[in-house]
Design a protein with these regions (language model features):
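Non-transmembrane, aqueous-exposed alpha-helical and coiled segments at domain scale
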Residues: 1-190
Length: 190
């Protein structure tokens, strides 16, 4: 997967078995395929964990076969809150967003203020990063939309828990894709 978020999905039917994927590449259904989530993806780790658990409950080996770029922008609760608040504020001019935080996460990526997957693996610096980000987003949430400010500590705890779950899957995706290309292997981007 090279870009996008968990707003869209792929529905696959193989041998009568229906599988719906939002983040995990469809190659996961083939046992010898390595799968990657690249740096262009805005990643809801919560949604990814749910997708992994659903697939593993069906007997698929997923966690050892999916690698995540350390540069992926992470979708966190403030992105979803902003997405929903903006959509509601538009009233009859709503754009039809899924309210899953994808647009606001891309905004943070472009503005160079968002968290990336690698940030979740560095607990010593994580709190300061989240505090800096929430200085900005809590102002918008409270002053523009009249919402309650998010707790830095709650967001740090949530991020650390997700980082611990995914730490073994974060890898140099670009480097591995380069190796595969040099070996003459076929690579499919979706």
């Amino acid at each position: 997967r090279f870009q996008g978020g968990h707003n869209a999905g792929h529905t696959l039917v193989i041998d009568g078995q229906k599988t719906v994927l939002h983040l995990i590449p469809s190659g996961i259904l083939q046992p010898d395929v390595e799968c990657f989530i690249g740096n262009g993806v805005v990643l809801s780790l919560k949604a990814l964990r749910e997708e992994i658990e659903e697939l593993e409950a069906k007997g698929l080996e997923v966690r050892s076969r999916v690698r995540i770029s350390p540069a992926c922008a992470i979708i966190l609760p403030w992105h979803e809150m902003l997405d929903r608040a903006r959509e509601e504020a538009r009233g009859d001019r709503a754009i039809g967003t899924t309210c899953r935080g994808i647009g606001p996460a891309y905004e943070d990526k472009v503005a160079r203020r968002g968290l990336r997957t690698s940030d979740l693996l560095n607990p010593a610096k994580l709190e300061a990063k989240i505090e800096h980000i929430l200085d900005f987003h809590n102002f918008v949430l409270t002053q523009r939309f009249g919402m309650k400010a998010l707790s830095v500590q709650e967001m740090v705890d949530q991020a650390l828990e997700l980082g611990a779950y995914f730490k073994d899957q974060v890898a140099d995706v670009s480097g591995r894709l380069y190796e595969l290309r040099e070996q003459g292997r076929r690579v499919m981007f979706e």
